[in-house]
Amino acid sequence: MKYIVILGDGMADKDIPELGNKTILDVAKKPHIDGLKGVLGMARTVPKELKPGSDVANLAVMGYDPLKCYTGRSPLEAVSIGINMKETDVAIRCNLVTLSDDEDPKKRTMFDYSAGEISSEEARELIEAVERELGDDEFKFYPGISYRHCLIWDNGKTGLDLTPPHDISDRVIGEYLPKN
């Protein structure tokens, strides 16, 4: 038997005051989804020990134990763009972003975590330029889609304290720069 798994990733959203403090999903006309409400229950897909996110939840829904195999979103994204990783490789998401132009890089503000929804073609040119300037036997930059790219670190360090750019929109980036 074949199955189709449909994940409504991010569908819950946040309450919107203009919609009477309801979500877009609350006010949308969706008779088929509403019909499932009486048939389905709730499931915890993300273990309490892990931060909720689509990466962790998708692993669990597909039958993997995130507590045993989850090391971050980046290895999943690396594989999704065709990167063959070695056991000793560490994948790090490499986003193109838009920052303010303050002279001190630590005082710059994250204006846009998606570089203005940069096109994949423009982004490829930038990541290839970064690879030419910074890539070597240890660090390799790979173009992905739009603002989302990948850095593979050969024999890299794990357990880094990294903050996703979308978590710090409109904030000064200094305290969120990589640590360890």
How would you name each of these model-derived features?
Residues 2, 12-134:
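Active-site nucleophile/metal-coordination loop of metallo-enzymes that catalyze phosphate/sulfate
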Residues 4-6:
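Residue-level marker for buried hydrophobic side chains located in beta-strands
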Residues 110-180:
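Glycine-rich, mobile lid/loop segments that gate access to catalytic sites or pores
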